[in-house]
Each structure stands twice: as C-alpha cells, then as structure tokens.
Amino acid sequence: MKQKAKDENVLAQNRQARHDYFIKDTYEAGIALTGTEIKSVRARHVTLRDGYVQIINGSAFLENVHIDEYKEGNRYNHDPLRSRRLLLHKKEIAKLADVKAQKGMTIVPLKVYLKHGFAKVLIGVAQGKKEYDKRETIKKRDQDRELRRKYRI
C-alpha cells in the first residue's frame, strides 16, 4: 500500500506564528470537535491566525480559532469561534500551565492535521518577538535567498 506524504494531511497552518514568536517547544494534542466542525476541518475551512491556548481548571482549551460553519449543517451548525477542548495528558497540561505562568510566554496553535483519521493540532510554546527580531529574521531570510539564487546560476 502506498504511503501518503506527511504534508498532504495538513489542513491549516499558522504561518504568522513563526513570524511573531520564537517557538520554544511543541506538543501534539487532539481536538474535541462536533460533527459539523470536523466536516468543516476536513474541508480546510480553518483559520488559526489569532488562536491561542488557555488553561482553565486543569483543562486546555483552544480559543479564538475560527472554524467556518458547515455549508450543509443547517440548524445543527456550531458557533465558529467557540472554545474547543484540547486532549492532552495531565502532566503535559501541568507543564503548559507552568510555562504560561512565566512572563512573556504564550501557547499558540501552529497547524491542524489529520492523523489516523483524527484531527490533531500542533501547539507551540512561544515567546514574543520584538520588532528588531522580526526585521533580523526577514534580513536573514533575504540573504539566504540571495545566496541560493547566486549559486544556482
């Protein structure tokens, strides 16, 4: 049986997160979704840009992630911006709570993908970049692009 490429299962990515934050660590978490939500996710109608993870009473929740209403969902449709529970081990949630308590640290979703038929989200422990850090990153990326262009000819 032919193996699928890993990127083929990626349904949404948060490219802005890598630009705005230094990603220190990543965790894979399951997402508790309703029927119409998983159908919208499979149709790639997910926006992660403004999302973040909040820890409330020992549970992790994905906040401010927009999953469009399912077109065929009629009256059973979901609220596009509702909080969605993340499925993590208690020890992982405790680690994330400790990290989030530190000043300047946050937890952001990086990508949503399917793994063995289940929707998963890759969350990253992140530290915000300053404006000069962003400019430095852009400058380095431009230099790398110029070098590749120069040696390709």
UniProtKB/Swiss-Prot annotation:
Q: Which Gene3D superfamilies match?
A: 2.40.280.10
Subcellular location, principal: cytoplasm
UniProt-listed GO biological process terms: trans-translation
**From what superkingdom does this record's organism come?**
Bacteria
List keywords of the entry alphabetically.
Cytoplasm, RNA-binding
- Pfam families named in the record: SmpB (PF01668)
Q: Which family does it belong to?
A: Belongs to the SmpB family.
Alphabetical list of PANTHER family matching this protein: SSRA-BINDING PROTEIN, TMRNA-BINDING COMPONENT OF TRANS-TRANSLATION TAGGING COMPLEX
Q: What is this protein called?
A: SsrA-binding protein
